[in-house]
UniProtKB/Swiss-Prot annotation:
Pathway: Amino-acid biosynthesis; S-adenosyl-L-methionine biosynthesis; S-adenosyl-L-methionine from L-methionine: step 1/1. Its cofactor is Mg(2+); K(+). Binds 2 divalent ions per subunit. This is S-adenosylmethionine synthase. Pfam families: S-AdoMet_synt_C (PF02773), S-AdoMet_synt_M (PF02772), S-AdoMet_synt_N (PF00438). HAMAP family: S_AdoMet_synth1. It comes from Pseudoalteromonas atlantica (strain T6c / ATCC BAA-1087). L-methionine binds at E56, Q99, D239, K270. One of its GO terms (cellular component) is cytoplasm. ATP binds at H15, D164, A165, K166, R230, F231, D239, R245, K246, A262, K266.
């Protein structure tokens, strides 16, 4: 029996990099509400007392960048200088310009279905049967821990919690099946008045125990709750934040490969984002169809070219049919040209701010999580 450990992490919506992601996607959503065909590439930088929003946009829409930024920071929970960041008093700098016409001519076409990819690149999609949402267990539970932290904080149940937090979960695998949790790390920002002992007890009882299944916790499971003992200075005061700096948190926690492209702030003509979503959709439907226990798909594009330059399916020896057969089925059942996948997943909508914290995958509210192709795939595979 082969045994190994695998670890994934997550961060809360109040982490500096995630603040930046959420602001970038708030800007994207506001523009898409007015102009679904807009071209947006929005980058955000946050540091003590300031937010800088930049990038390139092609649209006739007008949005109030300062108001969007302040509202986003306020919703996250940074509303007082005691937290090191305040939505109402921070400086907001706007450095957004226009997208290069050289890119436009490569993307825009007379026939919409001939729309070219907004850039070259490679993207991966992944799914596995080890959780109810067909995602790897380590990143799934890492997300749920920090999401629970935010819920408890916002409800006022633990009024000393602050927005910045991180989690990390190490699972024990036997023959590639999760059988237990070896270690849990949770660090949360807090106000100065709470003691370390109070914090550790409350985090264990109110955050960790309600989230992690008891079947995976043993007497040998190790817990590291605020292991430095103090986390008062956090958020943008503790570290600067940038859009696109949490790409492994955003995807599969390191369990699958990554093409390197970030998601937040990018409209769906950018295949870094839309094709990664399509890849998840493909992989999840293959696993949901029972055609494999684990599935990873790679898709690649050339700028200005509609057809993918490559499609490859890998099932790590768990497939009910060969990977070559699955690759053929993917080509037959999924539209992976940029225009086609945008239509397939209905991506020209303001749905992106919600993706910018707690992972883009494994959350049923998003269209790339549908398993509506599973029956057709299974039938086509003659299973």
């Amino acid at each position: 029996m082969a045994k190994h450990l695998f670890t994934s992490e997550s961060v809360s919506e109040g982490h500096p990099d995630k603040i930046a992601d959420q602001i970038s996607d708030a800007v994207l959503d506001a523009i898409l509400k007015q102009d679904p065909k807009a071209r947006v590439a929005c980058e955000t930088y946050v540091k003590t007392g300031m937010v800088m929003v930049g990038g390139e946009v092609t649209t006739n829409a007008w949005v109030d960048i300062e108001e969007l930024t302040r509202n986003t920071v306020r919703e996250i929970g940074y509303t007082h200088s005691d937290m090191g960041f305040d939505a109402d008093s921070c400086a907001v700098l706007n450095a957004i310009g226009k997208q290069s016409p050289d890119i436009n001519q490569g993307v825009d076409r007379t026939r919409p279905e001939d729309q070219g990819a907004g850039d070259q690149g490679l993207m991966f999609g992944y799914a596995s049967d080890e959780t109810d949402v067909l995602m790897p267990a380590p990143v799934t539970y890492a997300h749920r821990l920090v999401k629970r932290q935010a819920e408890i904080r916002k409800s006022g149940q633990l009024d000393w919690l602050r927005p910045d937090a991180k989690s990390q979960v190490t699972f024990v695998y036997e023959d590639n099946v999760p059988v237990g949790i070896d270690a849990v790390v949770l660090s949360t920002q807090h106000c100065d008045s709470v003691t370390t002992e109070q914090l550790r007890e409350a985090v264990m009882e109110e955050i960790i125990k309600p989230v992690l299944p008891a079947k995976w916790l043993t007497a040998q499971t190790k817990y590291f709750i605020n292991p430095t003992g103090r986390f008062v200075i956090g958020g943008p005061m503790g570290d600067c934040g940038l859009t696109g700096r949490k790409i492994i948190v955003d995807t599969y926690g390191g369990m699958a490969r990554h093409g390197g492209g970030a998601f937040s702030g990018k409209d769906p003509s950018k295949v870094d984002r839309s094709a990664a979503y399509a890849g998840r959709y493909v992989a999840k439907n293959i696993v949901a169809a029972g055609l494999a226990k684990r599935c990873e798909i790679q898709i690649s594009y050339a700028i200005g070219v509609a057809e993918p330059t490559s499609i490859n399916v890998e099932t790590f020896g768990t497939g009910q049919v060969s990977d070559e057969v699955l690759t053929t089925l993917v080509r037959e059942h999924f539209e992976l040209r940029p225009y086609g996948l945008i239509k397939m997943l209905d991506l020209e909508r303001p749905i992106y701010q919600a993706t910018a914290a707690y992972g883009h995958f494994g959350r049923e509210e998003f269209p790339w999580e549908k398993t509506d192709k599973a029956d057709a795939l299974r039938a086509a595979a003659n299973l």
